[in-house]
Amino acid sequence: MSNVRYISNLTRETYALILAGGRGSRLHELTDWRAKPALYFGGKFRIIDFPLSNCINSGIRRVGVVTQYKSHSLIRHVMRGWGHFKKELGESVEILPASQRYSENWYQGTADAVFQNIDIIRHELPKYVMVLSGDHVYRMDYAGLLAAHAESGADMTVSCLEVPIAEAAGSFGVMEVDEEMRILGFEEKPQQPKHSPGNPEMCLASMGNYVFNTEFLFDQLKKDALNESSDRDFGKDIIPAIIEKHNVFAYPFKSAFPNEQAYWRDVGTLDSFWQANMELLSPTPALNLYDAKWPIWTFQEQLPPAKFVFDDDDRRGMALDSIVSGGCIISGATVRRSVLFNEVRVCSYSLVEDSVVLPDVVVLRHCKIKNAILDRGCIIPEGMVIGYNHDHDRAKGFRVSEKGVTLVTRDMLGLPVGYE
């Protein structure tokens, strides 16, 4: 019981800041009208729901969401889905756009995004500040990270995981540690990452999740703000500057529950986004969205149940090995191994396979679609074939990924744009 109380005290003394202003440029047109944290995932969620749910499930009830790029849909989603917290009980989820309080600039980097909100953080009087990436899909008990930080006497703790060197090159901050997990070296997105101890194929990559002692964080941010050559970034500037003279430790990422494999996905490319959604269709997926022990919270629209209509031999409405969300109608069509978000309509004689279909999409009659991502609000013309011939897809103006996933957006179809 004392350990439970200890963890509870730590989480109550923590303010979490989720950095949710990223564009996600490797997702191409999929993030033309929304920030990456606002991107849909898993049939009904948005990416921002995962770090927010981790906070709530970990007992952290004071959260700020830092926004910048194309933030309208993100702000609207957080206000609708996360506005039920009670300030009188010490709970809050606040939206923190760039205030330009200390300069006329927007957020210049991850460290600057925190620096511009120092006054708001100070008002909360936290003992610890947790800085979290808002654009990854994962389950993590932040209480364990906090406990490790407090017990080690660290000034800063960096959450990390092992990543193949080829995958990490140019994409992740990479660290070197000693046997006590003290960070000895840190490089931001090196082209030739240094391997983990005893494992030449893997390296220790930063997850972009940090815990700081509050006053230590403030001191380092103020120093960085005076450095004219700084990029105002934790990975590029803050961490390399402090590892020699201060206690900076790594915390290995682990599952929220014993004997379960830890789950973390970057979903930063079209292929990884498609693959992570497809993984959810497994009978026992690595990310179990149905696990009541660690629920993923989100904004719940009031929609009717999904409906499957017609049962003729050549016109049967059915979905197999798929996720089909509220408001969907499968009308005499077949859906296989696909994720359908809310209010999707698939009309008679059409076939949708191995695809991710975002909200409000209409697939008209006699279409054949496979290995595709259909962006929100697309209306697929009658008889259109997508995903069967990549040259034909490109000729229609669609984007084909490195691994053969076809992205279709409203703009590519000649429809008015602006869906978020």
UniProtKB/Swiss-Prot annotation:
Protein keywords: ATP-binding, Carbohydrate metabolism, Glycogen biosynthesis, Glycogen metabolism, Nucleotide-binding, Nucleotidyltransferase, Transferase
Entry's Gene Ontology BP terms: glycogen biosynthetic process
EC number(s) recorded for this UniProt protein: 2.7.7.27
Pathway assigned to this chain's UniProt record: Glycan biosynthesis; glycogen biosynthesis
Single Gene Ontology MF annotation: ATP binding
Pfam families in UniProt: Hexapep_GlmU, NTP_transferase
Superkingdom field: Bacteria
Subunit comment: Homotetramer.
Protein name: Glucose-1-phosphate adenylyltransferase
Organism: Shewanella baltica (strain OS185)
Phylogenetic placement of the source organism: Bacteria, Pseudomonadati, Pseudomonadota, Gammaproteobacteria, Alteromonadales
